[in-house]
Amino acid sequence: MTGLNTAGADRDLATAELNRELQDKGFLLTTTEDIINWARNGSLHWMTFGLACCAVEMMQTSMPRYDLERFGTAPRASPRQSDLMIVAGTLTNKMAPALRKVYDQMPEPRYVISMGSCANGGGYYHYSYSVVRGCDRIVPVDIYVPGCPPTAEALLYGILQLQRRASGAPARW
């Protein structure tokens, strides 16, 4: 499939394949781990760690135009209820321990998306004495979303790639 509206194509293919298998055999043979991963893939609970202007673009993904929740994600205020942290903005040396503390409070499996040039590598403030040159020096990052600031579409694409990666399919980045 080509075009802009291919977000649910993989899910539709998987559903069609599952229906064919159920019609042929009448039962489905799988593991508990596969079922749990399938359920987790469709229900990412994310929390924001917005530090600068990228956080404004992050908020736009939850607005009606993009409606991030239609992909099975939901915002959470507590790290103990989240399995995805989106780091957006300039990370300073003073803020780095707080970022690590929040990350450590998240339950397993936990994912991190680094959003924007500042979170990816320090951005415009890269050579400043007080800026961490990328949040991947503090926490392991799964997906990098480039841009200054990245658009809401770029973040949405990054979240969809994380869902593909969590399901075991290769990410298309």
From Swiss-Prot:
Catalytic activity: a quinone + NADH + 5 H(+)(in) = a quinol + NAD(+) + 4 H(+)(out)
Membrane topology label: Peripheral membrane protein
Top-level taxon: Bacteria
Entry's Gene Ontology molecular function annotations: 4 iron, 4 sulfur cluster binding; iron ion binding; NADH dehydrogenase (ubiquinone) activity; NADH:ubiquinone reductase (non-electrogenic) activity; quinone binding
UniProt remark on cofactor binding: Binds 1 [4Fe-4S] cluster.
EC number of this enzyme: 7.1.1.-
Keyword presence, Zinc-finger: no
Coiled coil: none
Cofactor: [4Fe-4S] cluster
Pfam families associated with the record: Oxidored_q6
Gene Ontology BP terms: aerobic respiration; electron transport coupled proton transport
Location(s), subcellular: Cell inner membrane
Functional note: NDH-1 shuttles electrons from NADH, via FMN and iron-sulfur (Fe-S) centers, to quinones in the respiratory chain. The immediate electron acceptor for the enzyme in this species is believed to be ubiquinone. Couples the redox reaction to proton translocation (for every two electrons transferred, four hydrogen ions are translocated across the cytoplasmic membrane), and thus conserves the redox energy in a proton gradient.
Family named by the database record: Belongs to the complex I 20 kDa subunit family.
Subunit structure of this chain's protein: NDH-1 is composed of at least 14 different subunits, Nqo1 to Nqo14. The complex has a L-shaped structure, with the hydrophobic arm (subunits Nqo7, Nqo8, Nqo10 to Nqo14) embedded in the inner membrane and the hydrophilic peripheral arm (subunits Nqo1 to Nqo6, Nqo9) protruding into the bacterial cytoplasm. The hydrophilic domain contains all the redox centers.
Protein name: NADH-quinone oxidoreductase subunit 6
